[in-house]
Amino acid sequence: MAEWQTECMLPPTQPGFEGVGPHPGRVLQNTSGNIQSYSDTLAHTDPTGRDDHFSHYGFKYPHQPPVPTHPMPTTTGLHPQQVINNRFHTKKLRRLQSLGPNLIGPRRTRSYLKSQKYIEYRARPRRDTGKDGEPVWSDELEDAFQQALEANPPMGRRKWSERGKSYGRNELIAEYIYKTTGKRRSRKQVSSHLQVLDSFLKGDPDWERLVREQPADRSNGQPPSAGPRWRNSLELPFSSHYNSHNYPSYHDSLRPVQSYSGELPPPHVVFHPNLHAEATNINKIYGLSFDMWVSAPNQPGGIESAFHLYTRLQGDQRHPAPPKRLENIPNWRTSFPHLNSVMADVNNPLNCDIILLEANLRLMDDFPPSGSKLGIQLELDFTQPPNGDALTNQMENWSCSTYIYEEGQNIYRARQDLPKQQSNKVKPPFESTWWAKRFTELTEIAKDRQLNELADRQTRDYFRTLTAVQEIRATPSSRRVSNQYPDNSQDDSKRMAILLWQFRQTRSNEVGTTTWRRVTSPSSDRNTIPSPKPVTGIDLPPLSFYANSLARPAPSIYQAPQSHDLVHHNGTSQPQWSMYQPPQDSIFNANGGFDLLNSITKPEGGLHDKTAVTSVLDTYPNLQPEVSQPTSLNGSNGGPGMLSIPDMSLSHTNLNAYNLSGHDNHYGTPQHPGVSVPDNSHVLNNGIFGSSTQSIDDMSQTHAPWPTPTSSITDVGSSNYSHLQFSDHHVPSVSRESHQPNHFEVLLGPDDLIVGSMPGDPGINGAAHGHMNHTYTENNAVEAA
């Protein structure tokens, strides 16, 4: 069976000068300041093979490169490669002339670059560093800065309007630098750099021409008709834009500092693979961080104290793997149903980043000590717009919707509001409550591999069918809605990013790694992606998954348990451990760390038209699947609608469950038993995860300590675990009554929903509404984080 291999996230290397043109022996001259004589020599030689340098001549020579007036050689008698070169050469000249005088006009010399003060300034060691850890004005950025001065003529106090926004000259220079190098420099940094250079270059005619308006331009009172000279060239198609450099690399003789090797990297090769998306969506995901680990008890909850690492983002976070087209992802429509519905919505075109994350998870071979915590931190870094204004000043009301699928079936859905961001970094939760439950079950399977070799294959098959989609949305701030979003409707939230998750299990000798890459699916190319066929007739419930399962048994990893598949555990129970103590606020700061410790927001309305869990997991259903929302937790028709949450029971009698320690949670007495969610996961537990004698309940965000295991199930009142509160949905309040000691519970508000189940307990079903609990085995409760 083929295993999914991880890919290294190395940035594409730039081609060297050795393979450019028929002059490989001039490499050292080109990188050591002799570009003047080198270009003069090349100007009188055959241009074949030097197509990448034609755009440089527009700035170098006072006249346009003449179009050959003599007849071009015919294809008769020429080598095919020569024919291709001739055609390509003619096309380049035609494109170069089509750009007009903005780029091919005469370029004056810049004598200030040879001044003694400028040479001494550039010879200084670069001590100041930017947010990216590199010198603020390295040689590469200085080259781009000098090019930007040429490409953006002085405009005084006037503004350049584009895409409904106004840009000053410094903002245009900052955007030019970013598009050319992929490195962000703010408007204030550009302004400061101009002031530093102006302090010792003021008075130089060439410098004055680049930084101050000429009297002739000022007398007109209008900006140049062509605007910034580089804007049109960057709007060329993607392929032609990268194959022709329209901006000369800044080199000059007498330059004291050795220039960086190679030319300026082609813009957007790594950072922005799609120019159309850049033009319609300024806020891009520039970096990403993701870790999933288990930290030791009585240790800080950070990854520094982790003793097991499930997975971690591999390589440079700001240099993802090469982009991938959406149609090249196998079965993306069934693997990511939410994305499929978004792509099919013609009234709301997709204009945000799509990120594909492929996570290799390394499972644990045994349970961790009692009190261990599961940590998951996910962080997105949105780039700063060219005007230097922070992204959070433009957007507010950030939210994250998470959809988890097994074989295309939605098994989990949650929406959470994100705290107010203080920077461009957004920290969406990744449902550690759900993962803690899964890891507990999968850890038990890994522990029993010697007894059941089929368990390893079942676990791997399970991860292959597991996918997730996360949608990040935000609302434009009130002071910007009127002028930037004039056509906003009642729901004026904007889709900021979509994350696609695929999972695999590592081999025994591998470490868990995660890669991420952009998925290219621009709005302009949506017609190339086949959309679902329009509905013709009466709308019926979808039959793609349910009808086939009713007609014949579908292959699934959740098979009915067989006698030879069940693993019986005859070992003695492990010793009892004390419950995990209430967490301290120092574990994670909600304002500074990853805010994954708050309660889950899981509105009931988010699970509309969801088939009952028993119908989804049962391989041989006998009844018509339910498509209506249950109105109560025990299946009755009375009472207000409650959220039905399946309980994932544990099958190992010696199982240590995750404890979840929460930042804002408190501890109180548990409740009396009441209405609970029916145990709808027995097929899953008995099929892939073995026989079930215990249950593990919902867990909160970010942390999950393992508590005490037991070998028997106590009665209903012996131990309880309360779910975290669900926002955006009002449910009947639950009474807080005293109960037996030595149990764990989270104090919830008056509108919180407490749900739970005890598999196989006859005394729990049929209880009245308003008295709900989530039972768990004695001394094996789950602490919420």
From Swiss-Prot:
Q: Which SMART domains match?
A: TEA
- Free-text disruption phenotype from the record: Forms aberrant phialides.
Region entry Disordered: which residue ranges? 1-22, 213-232
- Alphabetic keyword roster: Activator, Conidiation, Nucleus, Sporulation, Transcription, Transcription regulation
The record's annotation in Gene3D superfamilies points to: TEA/ATTS domain
Q: What is an example of a GO molecular function annotated in this UniProt entry?
A: RNA polymerase II cis-regulatory region sequence-specific DNA binding
Please name the InterPro entries in this protein's record.
Answer: TEA/ATTS_dom, TEA/ATTS_sf, TEC1_TEAD_TF
Pfam families of this UniProt entry? TEA
Biological process, per Gene Ontology? conidium formation; sporulation resulting in formation of a cellular spore
Q: What GO terms fall under cellular component here? A: nucleus; transcription regulator complex
> What does the induction field say?
Expression is controlled by brlA.
Q: Using the UniProt record, give the first listed, main subcellular location.
A: nucleus
What family does the Swiss-Prot or TrEMBL record give for this protein?
A: Belongs to the TEC1 family.
Q: What is this protein called?
A: Conidiophore development regulator abaA
